[in-house]
Amino acid sequence: MVTLSSPSVIAGGRDIDSTGYAWWSGNARLINLSGKLLGAHVAHAGLIVFWAGAMTLFEVAHFVPEKPMYEQGIILLSHLATLGWGVGPGGEVVDTFPYFVVGVLHLISSAVLGLGGIYHALRGPESLEEYSTFFSQDWKDKNQMTNIIGYHLILLGLGAFLLVFKAMFFGGVYDTWAPGGGDVRIISNPTLNPAVIFGYLLKSPFGGDGWIVSVDNLEDVIGGHIWIGLICISGGIWHILTKPFGWVRRAFIWNGEAYLSYSLGALSLMGFIASTMVWYNNTVYPSEFFGPTAAEASQSQAFTFLVRDQRLGANIGSAQGPTGLGKYLMRSPTGEIIFGGETMRFWDFRGPWLEPLRGPNGLDLDKLTNDIQPWQARRAAEYMTHAPLGSLNSVGGVATEINSVNFVSPRAWLATSHFVLAFFFLVGHLWHAGRARAAAAGFEKGIDRATEPVLAMRDLD
């Protein structure tokens, strides 16, 4: 009987003799079989889209409208809400039907991708070159490889413009900075000034500078997507119409494993950026859906106690804390009035519930005394008890014995998962880059297949 481990398997692309890899080596067997490799990737895309659709429907089925999303372990509906679907003023979910539609559309498209993957894995041509030179994937064909880069860049650019169109023409997106506590709005005047957009890339990543993570308005976000969309599409056209220059041909390694390493390196970089963005940024990741940032929870606790004690008669402008510094208010290193106590370390935090209470010199004592709105006090109290922290001691003054059962902030979960995955992708990038460079230099022979353990194992049946 023929089995996956049987030496009698003679199907091309599936045995050691024809590929140099055992069955458990996965897609490595398909390096030189572009049709089969396409099938594997299309099927993989189908699995990803299936998870997105199924998990969206799972979250819809379990969603409780009376509770905030971040208290329900939700990580997908929060993204859809950020895009302006199903939410109203203050981030309140008013309709879950759009989420249901998105989930079903993903399930349907996953079925199409799954069928495409099965077709190309089992029935389609083993090598796409047999069908058309347009789909050629000869790893050493430098011009074709840059053509493929061009197609991908154009698709990425169109993806960036999808967000632009949604924000500008198709209902808008959720803006946590909208007056009164956030709302969905049309972004009618995106920032196109290159000095502003590319200025983010020149900023320091440290402290209050924050590189691109410091973006705090949707005009800059959408304007940035316009720029990146134009750059990606222009770059795609450039790569399709031109051939790589001599220095490019000499500088890069041109084989399948090298391209894998380049891709893993890019994904790793994007993962690290996404991790820091979701942890620190409350504009692109609104706290109404993802929960407060660590700095936000800390500042909201100081604000909550200020509101409480002021109602009890405390003079918040002059009360001293146990260290002799201001108990409720103090000065920042640059002279602004900031919250006192341990949260002083987060003095440069900005949030939509706090900014209306600032003046030209930081927090405005008159506004704190007379202008605090009920929604600001409620939101701060909610954020104070849902810090994205897992510490048993206080962090920034926040008592992190969190006032919820089994609460894990989606912000903490997403930041951690993206950081861990980015790290492993970086390791994969280094591993495959090293192998590709060694192979190109001629001294990497790989594992000796004659002594491969699987060859000494019994057949699976």
UniProtKB/Swiss-Prot annotation:
The chain crosses the membrane at residues 57-81, 122-143, 166-188, 243-263, 279-300, 435-459. Keywords: Chlorophyll, Chromophore, Manganese, Membrane, Metal-binding, Photosynthesis, Photosystem II, Thylakoid, Transmembrane, Transmembrane helix. GO terms for molecular function: chlorophyll binding; electron transporter, transferring electrons within the cyclic electron transport pathway of photosynthesis activity; metal ion binding. Coiled coil: none annotated. SUPFAM superfamilies: Photosystem II antenna protein-like. Binds multiple chlorophylls and provides some of the ligands for the Ca-4Mn-5O cluster of the oxygen-evolving complex. It may also provide a ligand for a Cl- that is required for oxygen evolution. PSII binds additional chlorophylls, carotenoids and specific lipids. [CaMn4O5] cluster binds at E355. It is found in: Cellular thylakoid membrane. Pfam families: PSII. One of its GO terms (biological process) is photosynthetic electron transport in photosystem II. The keyword Endoplasmic reticulum does not apply. One of its GO terms (cellular component) is plasma membrane-derived thylakoid membrane. It is a multi-pass membrane protein. Belongs to the PsbB/PsbC family. PsbC subfamily. PSII is composed of 1 copy each of membrane proteins PsbA, PsbB, PsbC, PsbD, PsbE, PsbF, PsbH, PsbI, PsbJ, PsbK, PsbL, PsbM, PsbT, PsbX, PsbY, PsbZ, Psb30/Ycf12, peripheral proteins PsbO, CyanoQ (PsbQ), PsbU, PsbV and a large number of cofactors. It forms dimeric complexes. One of the components of the core complex of photosystem II (PSII). It binds chlorophyll and helps catalyze the primary light-induced photochemical processes of PSII. PSII is a light-driven water:plastoquinone oxidoreductase, using light energy to abstract electrons from H(2)O, generating O(2) and a proton gradient subsequently used for ATP formation. This is Photosystem II CP43 reaction center protein. It comes from Synechococcus elongatus (strain ATCC 33912 / PCC 7942 / FACHB-805). The gene is psbC.
